[in-house]
Regions:
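N-terminal Rossmann NAD(P)H-binding glycine-rich loop of SDR-like oxidoreductase domains
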Residues: 1-24
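Oxidoreductase cofactor-interface core, primarily capturing Rossmann-like NAD(P)-dependent enzymes
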Residues: 15, 22, 116-227
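Conserved glycine-rich Rossmann-like NAD(P)H-binding loop of the short-chain dehydrogenase/reductase
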Residues: 24-32
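NAD(P)H-binding glycine-rich loop region in Rossmannoid oxidoreductase-like domains
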Residues: 34-38, 42-93, 97-101, 112-118
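Alpha-helical membrane-targeting segments
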Residues: 38, 158-181, 225, 230-269
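Short alpha-helix in the Rossmann-fold core of NAD(P)-dependent oxidoreductases
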Residues: 84-88, 107, 126
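Mid/C-terminal beta-alpha module of Rossmann-like enzyme folds, strongest
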Residues: 194-257, 271-312
């Protein structure tokens, strides 16, 4: 039995589908919510309902579980996200329950740049969570991924919404000079599933990214081409972008850019470009070749919907 936290999210739905397609039995850990969860369509899974601060619920969810994929995190909530409760305390509770249950493998999805000494909240939280996992005594695999993209992501769809909602120009933090390494979601998930049967990948931390380095400016230009929207790209200092984003996050229920994303874009976020083919035998898709999800969508309407829709 495999338990997946965050199994209804962007990565989780794809991971659950691939695991089931490969013959694994999967249980999704759902947090209590009034809203109907976005379970993977047409995929046979079990469900356990528990928040990450409910130790009794977590113990019940672990019954019969041999492998845990921990995907849940607070960054998707933007400035309203509680990194301490979800990424740090939640990971500590989940690893404790997994250790008590005799779990044999624990996967954690982290970020390039994760470090408990980081000045950036998300990367610091991920670094602290990694330490909990390494010290838990459970055989682990930590995947520090680059920016992921695909249908329903926060990255390319967020850019598409910003382009649609921008009046002729788009502000680029530091001129879009930051170097990134976007990795297609399905390639990343294939790495997660493939490594499950590889003993050499136990008790290891892997940094993985896509097969090309692109500046943020290049990425925005490619997204403009895919969506058919041209905008003047205006360089802006991150010292100005950050307080502006803080204000926008406070005004609107949701916003396509969060302070967490701006922190992530302060420095280059890359790793060895050959990591995925060398370690996993997968040739990662090029960024421009996997943007069909951006075409033919009324992004202006989606932008307004995001601004005024509450989180579940």
């Amino acid at each position: 039995m495999i338990l997946v936290s965050g199994g209804t999210g962007f990565i989780g739905r794809s991971l659950v589908r691939q695991l089931v397609e490969n013959g694994y039995t999967v249980r999704i850990l759902l947090r209590p919510s009034r809203r109907t969860p976005r379970l993977p369509v047409g995929v046979n899974v079990e469900v356990a309902v528990s928040s990450l601060d409910d130790t009794r619920g977590l113990r019940a969810a672990m019954r019969g579980v041999k492998t845990v994929y921990h995907l849940a995190g607070g960054e998707g909530e933007g400035g309203r996200g509680n990194l301490q409760a979800v990424d740090i305390d939640g990971t500590a509770n989940l690893t404790a329950a997994a250790a008590d249950a005799g779990v044999e493998r624990f996967y954690y999805i982290s970020h390039l740049g994760a470090d408990r000494a980081s000045a950036f909240p998300v990367l610091k939280a991920k670094g602290i969570a990694e330490d909990y996992i390494r010290k838990s005594g459970i055989p682990y695999t930590i995947m520090r991924g680059s920016i992921l993209f695909g249908p329903d992501d926060n990255f390319t769809t967020g850019l598409a919404m910003l382009l649609a909602g921008s009046p002729g120009l788009l502000l680029l933090p530091e001129g879009g000079k930051t170097l990134l390494q976007p990795l297609w979601l399905e390639d990343f998930v294939s790495c997660l599933v493939w490594s499950l049967e590889e003993p050499d990948m136990v008790n290891q931390v892997f940094e993985i990214g896509g097969g090309e380095y692109l500046t943020l400016r290049q990425i925005v230009e490619i997204v403009m081409e895919a969506t058919g929207r041209r905008r003047l790209l205006v360089p802006v200092s991150n010292h100005l972008m950050r307080p502006l984003t803080v204000v926008l996050e406070a005004i609107f229920q949701r916003f396509p850019v969060s302070v967490f994303w701006l922190d992530y874009l302060v420095v280059n976020r890359t790793c060895a470009v050959d990591t995925v083919p060398r370690l996993f035998g997968i040739m990662p898709a090029r960024f421009a070749s996997r943007l069909d999800h951006l075409r033919g969508v009324r992004w202006g309407r989606e932008y307004l919907r995001m601004l005024f829709t509450r989180h579940g």
